[in-house]
Amino acid sequence: DTIGSIDDLIENNNTIIIKLENIILNLYRKKSIEWKKQVKIGDLFKCILGGTPSTKKNEYWDGDIAWVNSGEVNKLRIVSPSRYITKDGLENSATKLLPKKTTVIAITGATLGQVSLLEIDSCTNQSVIGILENNTLKHDFIYPMMINAIKKLVLNKTGGAQQHINKNDVETFEIFVPSEIEYFEYSQIVQPIFEYQSKLILQNKELLLLKNKYLQKFFG
């Protein structure tokens, strides 16, 4: 049974992906206890708020530039966009194209406080903030750092009926960061885990495409 075999492969990969995620987060928590330097997120990283091209203009949509809404941030990794926009849509709206491996956070709505990682270059809507890698600290630090910080960040800032945080809340939040040597030692361990996890996540994307092709061919 071809479909069953594909489903088994996807399920096996998902089990490993979740285990690797737990290893990453545990390693981060274990190592970060030793880090003494405290800085604001915005002093180290560029934080970018997304936007939405006007839905009244058809020429802004269905192009070849990936765009994700905050609902996608609910996923462990973002491998596919919600929609596609055009170059005109990108240039005539507040959205920005974020490179893959950008850590993204949902700042309002049902997915408030969710953190994910882009596995594709993509724009986002205005309910999402992207935190870009800098020259020294990469996604293997930023992503687990945000997973660790987000609960406190949200609790500090959400008041009354308006359940949201803003870009300034993220930028002014203080975190502990490793020295260059500490980060090198940490990254040597964690980066290969991220790479293997990413490989499995993208493999699952291909397996799903294969499954859908098979279903269309024989049952379409």
What role is predicted for each listed range?
Residues 58, 83-84:
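Short Gly/aromatic-enriched secondary-structure transition segments
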Residues 1-52, 62, 67, 176-220:
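Non-catalytic DNA-recognition/assembly elements of restriction-modification systems
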Residues 69-70, 86-148, 156-159, 167-168:
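A short beta-sheet element
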Residues 7, 147-150, 154, 194:
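Short amphipathic alpha-helical signal-transduction/dimerization elements
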Residues 36-76, 91-94, 158, 166:
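Low-complexity, Lys/Gly-biased intrinsically disordered segments
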Residues 115-116, 139-141, 153-155, 182-186, ...:
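Extended hydrophobic-aromatic, low-complexity segments
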Residues 76-82:
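Cytochrome P450 core scaffold surrounding the K-helix E-X-X-R motif
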